[in-house]
């Protein structure tokens, strides 16, 4: 017998050696709403078919938990892939990226995807769910798994596994359909309760349950500009021949890492230059831009972007001047509080909007103003003779999480503003059926930066991340489509460079801490990438903001 300590109810019970997590769940007589879908076993996420052979701590997860939702979505993706294989034996589906609170998929069947195709796929998916077919996981020597995928023509998975360096690899089956997924799946298709698939521009959108209320599906949010950014970068990846991590690893092994760095950096600089040109030429057309507003989520590289944009604006004969929103906080005792009673510095209303807008209007009308400095020790605004008056060629650069919120600058005419949204939108795929979450990219950047510059451990950064994400959902993401331009700060090669920085930091998270499961997941994910050294990374690279070695001052 073995002893299982269930963290859901803090009760320990004995079970036969080799019991599955599903057996253990039933043995505890638990009733978890919207679950279970997976479990943490000694703080590592496992599927419900996992069998225990030693004493374990187990915490069962539902789809309200991010790890549980990932298990649900992966399983739903496999069902979609099987439906496409059943209906279009010569077709192919690519699960490309999250957008509009769902997942954008490209269906390749030799013609344009029609509404009838979507209807057939949805019906076949429903049939698969209703049949309650089990997902099976097999582990074999990597050479055997590679040969299995090679015979199926799934070369994206062949390249991924061949470059993984692993002696053994696993794969999943759903009846006669085989696939590879990074992470656990549900025990069977019948665990899927809600989903939808709809036509979305020239592809499909896989809709999933709402993260807070799984009884309903996530609302489809229009993100046309965001989708176009993803597609533009996917096109460049395909031109470079590195659409997936396997492709990237092969290119690195053949000595092309430096070329990929140089081309990726050049593409970003070209994009920044184009944005600066648009700002300049709008002024030539009689709608002079006086205020550039830059917003984006945490660790998106807003600061370096604003510095590089300023250089390109200067190359157009303009004089950029940075304005920090941090200097416009209300006095500390006037700061709004969150539901826990703590000061909510991320709230728009933590800023003195009336005073900020008055100073902006005065500046734009040619008046001289004395700029404030916020003293974070006293929690008060101070004035120290820092005066500013803008001339005809001067342009104000305002960077902050609220920059695209219409409430921030309601009195500034739209023609005088140019709004830019910056985010790290990962466009390389693990393989054709495994996208890389954009939040993972930003979290890894933040873990490295916090450790290097702020003295925070990975454990602390991971612990705070959910509250950071909640602030983004409330204050940033609703306004991203307001942007005049979107800039993707993610670099094709950056996860391969961050690998050697992040893994040692992540290893420091003790396995008895709740944050270990996320640290372990990120570590295993990074191990798919070939390591690339940062010696070829230019000092102006956006990635230098997080790794160090930048020629900019922060």
Which residue ranges define each predicted feature?
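Conserved lysine of the Walker
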Residues: 302
């Amino acid at each position: 017998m073995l002893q299982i300590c269930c963290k859901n109810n803090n009760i320990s019970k004995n079970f036969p050696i080799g019991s599955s997590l599903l057996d253990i769940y039933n043995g505890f007589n638990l009733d978890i709403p919207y679950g279970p879908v997976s479990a943490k076993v000694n703080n590592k996420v496992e599927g419900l078919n996992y069998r225990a052979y030693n004493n374990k701590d187990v915490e069962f997860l539902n789809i309200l938990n991010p790890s549980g939702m990932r298990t649900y979505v992966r399983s739903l993706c496999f069902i979609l892939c099987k439906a496409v294989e059943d209906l279009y034996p010569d077709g192919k589906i690519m699960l490309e990226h999250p957008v509009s609170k769902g997942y954008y998929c490209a269906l390749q069947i030799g013609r344009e995807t029609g509404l009838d195709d979507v209807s057939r796929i949805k019906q076949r998916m429903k049939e698969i769910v209703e049949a309650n077919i089990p997902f099976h996981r097999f582990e074999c020597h990597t050479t055997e798994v590679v040969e299995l995928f090679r015979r199926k023509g799934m070369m994206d998975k062949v390249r991924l596994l061949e470059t993984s360096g692993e002696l053994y690899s696993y794969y999943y089956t759903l009846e006669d359909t085989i696939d590879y997924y990074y992470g656990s799946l549900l025990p069977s298709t019948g665990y899927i309760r809600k989903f939808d698939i709809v036509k979305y521009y020239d592809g499909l959108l896989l809709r999933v349950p709402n993260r807070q209320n799984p009884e309903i599906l996530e609302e489809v949010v229009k993100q046309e500009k965001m989708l176009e950014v993803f597609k533009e970068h996917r096109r460049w990846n395909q031109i470079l021949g590195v659409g997936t991590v396997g492709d990237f690893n092969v290119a690195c092994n053949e000595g092309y890492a430096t070329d990929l760095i140089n081309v990726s950096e050049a593409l970003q600089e070209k994009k920044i230059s184009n944005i600066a040109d648009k700002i300049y030429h709008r002024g030539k057309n009689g709608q002079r831009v006086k205020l550039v507003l830059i917003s984006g989520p945490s660790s998106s590289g807003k600061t370096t972007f604003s510095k590089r944009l300023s250089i390109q604006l200067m190359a157009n004969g303009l004089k950029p001047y940075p304005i920090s929103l941090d200097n416009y906080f209300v006095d500390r005792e006037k700061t709004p509080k969150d539901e826990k009673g703590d000061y909510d510095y991320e709230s728009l209303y933590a800023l003195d909007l009336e005073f900020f807008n008055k100073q902006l209007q005065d500046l734009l009308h040619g008046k001289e103003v004395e700029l404030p400095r916020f003293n974070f020790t006293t929690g008060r605004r101070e004035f120290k003779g820092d005066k500013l008056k803008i001339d005809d060629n001067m342009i104000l650069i305002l960077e902050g999480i609220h920059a695209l919120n219409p409430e921030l600058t309601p009195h500034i005419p739209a023609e005088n503003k140019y709004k830019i949204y910056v985010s790290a939108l990962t466009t390389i795929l693990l393989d054709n059926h495994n996208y890389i979450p954009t939040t993972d990219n930003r979290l890894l950047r933040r873990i490295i930066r916090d450790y290097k510059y702020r003295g925070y451990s990975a454990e602390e950064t991971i612990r705070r991340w959910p509250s950071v994400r909640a602030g983004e959902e409330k204050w940033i993401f609703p306004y991203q489509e307001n942007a005049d331009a979107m800039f993707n700060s993610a670099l094709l090669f950056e996860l391969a460079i961050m690998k050697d920085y992040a893994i040692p930091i992540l290893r420091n998270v003790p396995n008895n801490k709740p944050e270990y499961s996320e640290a372990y997941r990120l570590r295993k994910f990074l191990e798919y990438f070939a390591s690339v050294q940062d010696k070829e990374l230019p000092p102006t690279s956006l990635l230098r903001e997080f790794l160090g070695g930048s020629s900019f001052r922060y």
